[in-house]
Amino acid sequence: MKLATITFFLLTEIFFYISYAEATRSGPDLCPTIISKRDWGGNAALRVGYTSKPLERVVIHHTVTPECANEARCSSRMVSMQNYHMDELGYDDISYNFVIGGDGRVYEGVGWHKKGSHSPGWDSQSIGIAFIGDFTNKLPSREMLDAAKDLIVCAIELGELTRGYKLLGARNVKATKSPGDKLYREIQNWEGFTRRP
């Protein structure tokens, strides 16, 4: 009887350990690699606003800035973007939660469960994902598109986004041409797409 009890408790502990590790892991199996704000050279936010989680919306943007093809260039674009958003537009930080670089990497903007400045009226209810470049007349690379899709799956698995989320283009929530005509047509085929917030 003692051996059976010890075995039961040991197996229970192993089960809970594996379940906890599975629920808290973040890495290539669960999320795409995310280049942290510190790693791309970003400044700290002036103020941080938090969102409740899980959120129910993802808003897709394009930056209409020059593209980038490697981590050094994309990091430079991120620094320039953050400086413009803070110094010229008066935002507290870079406006997006995450940004997809031309190198197929995800760059941290304000990050998880923090309020961006990407979609007035919807910032506290959505994750803003921007693609570096102008996607009016061409699509982002397959690597960029896959990185964004992987990030959305990651958000769901981490509990940052509901499974029944709505995916919108920036033009669906404000007066803009973002995320560009070609990219907007593309995201209409993605899971969760809707024109109504």
UniProtKB/Swiss-Prot annotation:
Keyword Iron: no
Alphabetical list of PANTHER family matching this protein: PEPTIDOGLYCAN RECOGNITION PROTEIN, PEPTIDOGLYCAN-RECOGNITION PROTEIN SA
Native species: Holotrichia diomphalia
UniProt-recorded name of the protein: Peptidoglycan-recognition protein 1
Known function: Peptidoglycan-recognition protein probably involved in innate immunity by binding to peptidoglycans (PGN) of bacteria and activating the prophenoloxidase (proPO) cascade immune response. Binds to 1,3-beta-D-glucan and PGN.
N-acetylmuramoyl-L-alanine amidase domain: residues covered: 53-180
Tissue expr: Localizes to plasma (at protein level).
Family: Belongs to the N-acetylmuramoyl-L-alanine amidase 2 family.
Signal peptide from the UniProt entry: 1-23
